[in-house]
């Protein structure tokens, strides 16, 4: 079973509390999502592969370590996942970025996939799927399904807020996928929203309804 890690760093929890507030503006919400994603990256990227590289200091030549950035991919689930990309890219700017587009059918609460655009060598990359919310788990499961159909095998899911129902569903569907979240909330309501949650992350990121 993949691990579930709730990142309880004080800075992340402080910013997440502001993010949840109803009166947080679109501008502030967007900035906070970016900042939290970057802060989460410290733990999410802890086990990145390293490679030897020869460099020259002012004193001598030496072999040191660097991240094998060409073997990473960040894949946001559109549209809300876009808000988390830059925060992680600021830490690993050489990573490639793919996109998986989905929307939720408001009657069935099931995700519908409308776009998959990935690096050609996605099967050779360590992949970080990002989406602010892990609610029912439907979108996350479908995204991982799409990646595995294309040969991907090393996949991590990163979100800001999660529900126990979504975590359970993703773990059961894909037990090899690690989950990183900033908060594990109480439950889902009848409309499939996380409680207490933070509302619709996509609408709050882009100022839509």
From Swiss-Prot:
Tree of life domain: Bacteria
Activity regulation description: Allosterically activated by GTP.
A Gene Ontology BP annotation from the UniProt entry: uracil salvage
Xref: CDD domains: PRTases_typeI
Gene3D superfamilies listed in its UniProt record: 3.40.50.2020
Record-level Gene Ontology MF annotations: GTP binding; magnesium ion binding; uracil phosphoribosyltransferase activity
Annotated InterPro entries: PRibTrfase_dom (IPR000836), PRTase-like (IPR029057), Upp_B (IPR034332), UPRTase/APRTase (IPR050054), Ura_phspho_trans (IPR005765)
Enzyme Commission number(s) from the entry: 2.4.2.9
Enzyme class: transferase
Pfam family, one: UPRTase
Keywords for the protein's UniProt record, in alphabetical order: Allosteric enzyme, Glycosyltransferase, GTP-binding, Magnesium, Nucleotide-binding, Transferase
NCBIfam families: PRK00129.1, upp
Role this protein plays: Catalyzes the conversion of uracil and 5-phospho-alpha-D-ribose 1-diphosphate (PRPP) to UMP and diphosphate.
HAMAP family linked to this entry: Upp_B
Protein family membership: Belongs to the UPRTase family.
Protein name stated in the entry: Uracil phosphoribosyltransferase
């Amino acid at each position: 079973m993949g691990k579930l890690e709730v990142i309880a760093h004080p800075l992340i929890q402080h910013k997440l509390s502001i993010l949840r507030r109803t009166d947080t503006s679109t501008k502030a919400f967007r900035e906070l999502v970016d900042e939290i994603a970057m802060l989460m990256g410290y733990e999410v990227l802890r086990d990145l592969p390293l490679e030897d590289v020869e460099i020259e200091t002012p004193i001598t030549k030496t072999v040191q370590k660097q991240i094998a950035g060409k073997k990473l991919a960040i894949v946001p689930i559109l549209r809300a996942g876009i808000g988390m990309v830059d925060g992680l890219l600021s830490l690993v700017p050489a990573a490639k970025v793919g996109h998986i587009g989905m929307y939720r059918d408001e009657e069935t609460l099931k995700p519908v996939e409308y776009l998959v655009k990935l690096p050609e060598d996605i099967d050779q990359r360590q992949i970080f799927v990002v989406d602010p919310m892990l609610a029912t788990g439907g979108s996350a499961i479908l995204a991982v399904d799409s990646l595995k159909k294309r040969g991907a095998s090393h996949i991590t899911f990163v979100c800001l807020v999660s529900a126990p129902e979504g975590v359970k569903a993703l773990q059961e569907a894909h037990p090899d996928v690690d989950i990183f979240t900033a908060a594990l909330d109480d439950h889902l309501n009848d409309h499939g929203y996380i409680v207490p949650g933070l509302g619709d992350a996509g609408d709050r990121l882009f100022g839509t309804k």
